[in-house]
Every structure is written in structure tokens, then in C-alpha cells.
Amino acid sequence: MSTPARRRLMRDFKRLQEDPPTGVSGAPTDNNIMIWNAVIFGPHDTPFEDGTFKLTIEFTEEYPNKPPTVRFVSKVFHPNVYADGGICLDILQNRWSPTYDVSAILTSIQSLLSDPNPNSPANSTAAQLYKENRREYEKRVKACVEQSFID
Amino acid sequence: MENENRDEMIIKQQREIEREICEAIPLVSQLNEIGSLNDEYENDEVYINKIKDLQTKYRYMRRTRPDGNCFFRAFAFAYLEYLGKNTHDYISFRSLAQESKEKLIKLGFPQFTLEDFHDTFMEVVKKFDPAEISLDKDMTEELSLTFNEQGYSDYVVVYLRLLTSGKLQEEADFYQHFIEGNFTIEEFRHQEVEPMYKESDHIHIIALCSALDVCVRVEYMDRGDGGKIKAHDFPEGKEPKVFLLYRPGHYDILYPNK
């Protein structure tokens, strides 16, 4: 059945294929357009470089009026990523705009990897290390980058 | 505890509350007599007197769902109802709406997603062309159907929010003075205007009316003294085409006595 959410997701998918942003990719799962798999490549010149981080994106029929639920499947050590992979990012919560599409969501998460916001921590250890012991922070991040090759 | 995913817990709870409201109240109701307001304010002298005062000017109202979008939804319904009976204003509105897409893209809105909302918005606007509608009754029924279909109704609200946001950006120097707290116009647009379900304040009304070149009269009904409701026109000095009732936190549609 075609609904506004499904029609819009088809458009999002078409756009992502025709005009893919650098370093991210995503596609609906085989039998359900409401659940997508995505990959974000760790941005260059950050400790996340070379990592390939998998995510799932779950939409509801209220998309694009409400944001989807986005979650890392790969283990990610980052001040704004919860232990369960959930992401603390304003545009996925109170600053969501219906003008964002999947492409915008993925590129925003990619920038979050480069620029964490340690003041609203989802992982307090990562936030503290990021502020106080950058070397140890980078070491822990690199460990999850290596883990991402195996996943 | 700190590392629990609290955001998702809060969102889940909010969604449950929203679902309860959805089940109780349609997006836009049928016509109700103004007197039906009395049921909500039994033994409440202040409101009962104000409802009497409201009845001297208005006969009917339509309730809208209190989901934070009520101003935009009420405005769109009432204005399209007016335009459907006024060919001249309809034609100028339609061309303004048609051209607004390019204007928003120039202001930096993402073309790809904007088009989706604009297409649906224009589809709705074209349904209420006075040249296509023969009977008032048909139009009102069609409006009710359209505005109670969540897909259409919400897309219309989104597009009005984007027009409002665009106006705030275009005249940022002016609107900056009306913003309370430490928000920049940019932050305000992204946090209080573009997201669905965010309530509207005077600034939203002023910006939307200015973007669409239309005047809205809002009748304020609250606990204030005097027994009279107070009307405020946005902007002042023009003839209002849309009439809304404001009670703290909520807007409904009003129909003046003929």
C-alpha cells in the first residue's frame, strides 16, 4: 500500500542512489521499505578514519513529520552514542525538520563522528576522555574501528 | 543509570500521550455551535461570561486537534474555505503559492524535500478552485475530508511552517527583536518553527500572514478581567479573512455572524 511515508522513502532511496553523498550509503531491507540498513565510513583525519560503521534506520508512517529511529549496529565509542547504539543528536530529536531526508540524516551522523558534543553525553566515559585525555579517547576509538572490520 | 538511552524512553512516552489525543479528537471537527463551549467550563463564571460575549460576534466554531499544529491547521482550513468562495483572492493566492517554492529554494531550503511538500500543497490548493466548485456544501465536505486525512493535512502544515521559517529568515533583522531568550533566528527556525508539533506564538502568526499577505483575527479568551474577549488582528489595519479562537495553548476556527 502506498502511503505518504512510503512514497517519500522511495524518493529518498532514489535520490541516495542518484546523488550519493561521500562516505555514506543506505538502502531499504529486502522486504520492508520502513527498515533500512546503512553504512557510514569513518571521516578522514579523525580517529574514526577507515572504520565502516553499520546502522539501522527504522521509520514509522509518520515520517517525514517525525524522525526515524537510528541506531549503530557496529560498536561505536563516541560521547554521543549510547551503549545500545542509540544516537544523541538534536536533529533526530527536538530539532528534526521534515525537510531532512535519509541523505541528510546520514551526513549529519557522519559529522557527529568528527565533532562530538561532550556536553550532552550518551557515553560519559567517552565524553570525559574526549575532554580530558584525548590520547586515550583516540585509542579507544581506534579499537572500535578495528572491531568494525570484523563485524 | 546515566548511560541509559533516556531520549528514546522520553520519545516513547510522548508518543503514547499523542496517540491518546489522536483517538479522542479529529484533526478538524464538524461545525459546532459556540454555545457548545459551555460544556467545558461548567460553573466557571469568567469563561461563561466570555463565551456569551463571543456569541455576540460568532455563531459557529470548528475544533482542531491540540497537537501543537493547531494554529497552522486551523489557518489552512479557514483560509482555503474563504478562498474557495473568492475567485479574485484565490487566483492571487495560487500564484503566490506556486512561486513560493523557488523563493524558498533561493533562501537555501533543500530542493529535493521541499518539492515533495510543495507538490502536495499545490494539489490541495487546486482542489478548492472556486471555478471547480459549484456548491459551498460540497467544498466544506471536501475540506473536512482533506484535512482529516493525516497525509494531506500534515503536508499542508509542513509547507506553511516552511513558508513561516522562510519569512523569518528573509527578514531576520526585523524578527530578531521578537525572539525571547538567547535564540538566534536560525536556532528559533530550526527548533520552534520547522519541526511539526511545535506550538505557534505571535511571531509565527505575524510571519505567516506577512508571507501570504493575509490578515487573521484572533479572539483571545482567557482568565483576564473584564468579561470581554479581546480581538487582535495580524497585521492591524487590514480586513481579516480568517477568524480564530485562542484559548491558552490552543487555536480553533470561528465563523462570524452574518
UniProtKB/Swiss-Prot annotation, chain A:
The active site is at C88 (glycyl thioester intermediate). Pathway: Protein modification; protein ubiquitination. Keywords: ATP-binding, DNA damage, DNA repair, Nucleotide-binding, Nucleus, Transferase, Ubl conjugation pathway. One of its GO terms (cellular component) is HULC complex. It catalyses: S-ubiquitinyl-[E1 ubiquitin-activating enzyme]-L-cysteine + [E2 ubiquitin-conjugating enzyme]-L-cysteine = [E1 ubiquitin-activating enzyme]-L-cysteine + S-ubiquitinyl-[E2 ubiquitin-conjugating enzyme]-L-cysteine. Disruption phenotype: Lethality during the second instar-early third instar larval stages. Mutants show defective synaptic function as a consequence of mitochondrial failure. Disulfide bonds: none annotated. InterPro entries: Ub_conjugating_enzyme, UBQ-conjugat_E2_core, UBQ-conjugating_AS, UBQ-conjugating_enzyme/RWD. Pfam families: UQ_con. Its EC number is 2.3.2.23. Transmembrane segments: none annotated. GO terms for molecular function: ATP binding; p53 binding; protein domain specific binding; ubiquitin conjugating enzyme activity; ubiquitin-protein transferase activity. Its main location: nucleus. CDD domains: UBCc_UBE2A_2B. One of its GO terms (biological process) is protein polyubiquitination. It is found in: Nucleus. Gene3D superfamilies: Ubiquitin Conjugating Enzyme. Residues 4-150 form the UBC core domain. PANTHER family: UBIQUITIN-CONJUGATING ENZYME E2. Belongs to the ubiquitin-conjugating enzyme family. E2 ubiquitin-conjugating enzyme that accepts ubiquitin from the ubiquitin-activating enzyme E1 and transfers it to a E3 ubiquitin-protein ligase. Required for postreplication repair of UV-damaged DNA. Involved in the negative regulation of the Ras/MAPK signaling pathway in the wing by acting with the putative E3 ligases poe, Kcmf1 and Ufd4 to mediate the ubiquitination and proteasomal degradation of rl/MAPK. Required for in mitophagy. This is Ubiquitin-conjugating enzyme E2-17 kDa. It comes from Drosophila melanogaster. The lineage of its organism: Eukaryota, Metazoa, Ecdysozoa, Arthropoda, Hexapoda. The gene is Ubc6.
